[in-house]
């Protein structure tokens, strides 16, 4: 399955986990890696180019670090600009119907922090609900997220293993 991984990290050069994930994914022949901040540092998005990338792939992955319980700002801008009426939704807006969407999220906190009674008293499933609603609205199949918790405390080996698990997850049938 042709997979597009859209990497959304505003400081990718200083990243450990997301940069490792991205570099590992670039080695896969059926995975296209697209660095959104690298491509659009000024937030001026080439809508036609982005829409064509989506059309060329069956599985779309948003890869990002969790920032203030959400995704980095450029992803919201991308959604607003690229997922247009008449293309992604509304009359004639069926271009993404049947495609798959999943999230690959890195989080500094521990998994136990993201649950009822935890530090944040909310689950990741609840935090990513807007992505699920968007996927449903534009006719995409929303898949369970790939999450890596505790990224602030991972060893180099843990990061490498996380990248391998991500590759396996993206290649699996869901």
UniProtKB/Swiss-Prot annotation:
Q: Which SUPFAM superfamilies match?
A: Flavoproteins
Q: Which domain of life is it from?
A: Bacteria
* Keyword field: Oxidoreductase
What protein family is recorded? Belongs to the NAD(P)H dehydrogenase (quinone) family.
| Pfam assignment, any one | Flavodoxin_2
Which EC number applies?
Answer: 1.6.99.-
Organism in which the protein naturally occurs:
Bacillus subtilis (strain 168)
**PANTHER family assigned:** GLUTATHIONE-REGULATED POTASSIUM-EFFLUX SYSTEM ANCILLARY PROTEIN KEFG
Record-level Gene Ontology MF annotations: electron transfer activity; FMN binding; NAD(P)H dehydrogenase (quinone) activity
- The name on file for this protein is Uncharacterized NAD(P)H oxidoreductase YrkL
């Amino acid at each position: 399955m042709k997979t597009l991984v859209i990497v959304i990290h505003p400081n990718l050069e200083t990243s450990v986990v997301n940069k490792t994930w991205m570099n590992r994914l670039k080695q896969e022949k059926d995975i296209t890696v697209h660095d959104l901040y690298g491509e659009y540092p000024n937030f001026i998005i080439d809508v036609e180019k982005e829409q064509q990338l989506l059309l060329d792939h069956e599985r779309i992955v948003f890869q990002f670090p969790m920032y203030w319980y959400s995704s980095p700002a450029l992803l919201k801008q991308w959604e607003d600009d690229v997922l247009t009426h008449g293309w992604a939704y509304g009359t004639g807006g069926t271009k993404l119907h049947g495609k798959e969407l999943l999230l690959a999220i890195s989080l500094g906190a521990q998994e136990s922090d993201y649950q009822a009674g935890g530090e944040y008293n909310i689950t990741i499933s609840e935090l990513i609900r807007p992505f699920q609603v968007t996927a449903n609205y534009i006719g995409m199949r929303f898949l369970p997220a790939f999450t890596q918790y505790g990224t602030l405390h991972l060893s180099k080996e843990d990061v490498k293993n996380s990248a391998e698990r991500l590759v396996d997850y993206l290649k699996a049938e869901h």
